[in-house]
Amino acid sequence: MRSRKLALALVSALTTMAVGLGAQAANAVFPDFTGCTATNIATEGCIDIQNRSANFNIKGFNVPLGESLEIRGTLTSDGAGGLLFTPPRGTNGFFARAVPVPGGIFGIEWLPGNTVLAITELAGSPSQIKINTNDLSVRIPIKVRLVNLLLGMDCHIGTNSNPVNLNLITGTTSPPPPNTPISGRVGALRLFERGIIFTGNVNVENSFAVPGATECGLGLGLINSLVNLRLRLPSAAGNNSMAIVNDVALGTP
């Protein structure tokens, strides 16, 4: 019993650490166009993408992401048929909550000091977020911060220079083996007073690679190998997948 109480206390401490990182938290309000700077509705608009459930799978190791992710900002025509993403002031437009990694470091849920929280982060600049409003696909480079008293505050899977590159589509994928094609879909469309909402979209991706861990263990990489062993990293393209159920709102401020 004492070990379980200690485990709960450590979870609380880790959550406080995660908040202290300054991670931009996903919003429960939908749609949320806070920070959208669109003024010319002919060439600009607001977007809010919030996930309802998600799974990130690395060689069979599954991490449920829950309702932890959001992309929010302004879309502007680039004059060549594409769209430029601008985040709300003071943010990068990508918002995430910390989620627990099943089994923690050692694969034993209740073991004191074992709990690991994962925070998905944008890897690089907001300009690298590419959104297609025709098919609701999203291209985005990410990295995942792992937070644990042993791992330290700088442990990451992926970096700005070597990210996990996701192309989340609503169509059918064409992955390298051993993965096989999977399909997403565009959800139901409805109107609201400031625009349109698509609910229940499914975006999928299973052609990406996942690099090994970096800076785990006091920021010195002392236990990168332990993290890689636990999460089966690095993992080549064709062994990983991500599926997200989300709602998308497009409109005016």
Label every PLM stretch briefly.
Residues M1-A28:
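Secretory targeting and sorting signals
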Residues N27-P253:
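Extracytosolic secretory-pathway proteins
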